[in-house]
Amino acid sequence: MAEVKQESLSGITEGEAKEFHKIFTSSILVFFGVAAFAHLLVWIWRPWVPGPNGYSALETLTQTLTYLS
């Protein structure tokens, strides 16, 4: 009898699938790393969770900048 060769639904070989998976996982890790770094920079610039005094610290900064200009 003839041996039945299993073929994937996508039509790519196992080696090609492993290569694609390697590139995909490294790309997604780089994307998440850049996104986390961007969120960190935005957090340093303007935190989205208020401190113990609320956003009053930002009001003082606004008044100071208005006075200086």
Curated annotation (Swiss-Prot):
Matches recorded under InterPro entries: Antenna_a/b (IPR000066), Antenna_beta_CS (IPR023623), Antenna_beta_dom_sf (IPR023624), LHB-1/5 (IPR002362), Light-harvesting_complex (IPR035889)
Function comment: Antenna complexes are light-harvesting systems, which transfer the excitation energy to the reaction centers.
Domain of life per record: Bacteria
Protein name: Light-harvesting protein B-870 beta chain
Record text on subunit structure and interactions: The core complex is formed by different alpha and beta chains, binding bacteriochlorophyll molecules, and arranged most probably in tetrameric structures disposed around the reaction center. The non-pigmented gamma chains may constitute additional components.
Alphabetized GO MF terms: bacteriochlorophyll binding; electron transporter, transferring electrons within the cyclic electron transport pathway of photosynthesis activity; metal ion binding
Record's keyword annotation contains Coiled coil: no
Annotated membrane topology: Single-pass type II membrane protein
Main location: membrane
GO biological process: one example: photosynthesis, light reaction
Alphabetically ordered keywords of this record: Antenna complex, Bacteriochlorophyll, Cell inner membrane, Cell membrane, Chlorophyll, Chromophore, Light-harvesting polypeptide, Magnesium, Membrane, Metal-binding, Transmembrane, Transmembrane helix
Periplasmic topology ranges: 46-56
GO-annotated cellular components: plasma membrane; plasma membrane light-harvesting complex
Protein family (similarity comment): Belongs to the antenna complex beta subunit family.
Gene3D superfamilies given in the database record: 1.20.5.250
Propeptide residues per the UniProt entry: 1-2, 57-69
Cytoplasmic compartment spans: 3-22
Transmembrane segments: 23-45
Residues annotated for a bacteriochlorophyll binding in this entry: H21, H39
Cellular localisation: Cell inner membrane
Species in which this protein is naturally found: Rhodospirillum rubrum (strain ATCC 11170 / ATH 1.1.1 / DSM 467 / LMG 4362 / NCIMB 8255 / S1)
Pfam families reported in the protein's UniProt record: LHC (PF00556)
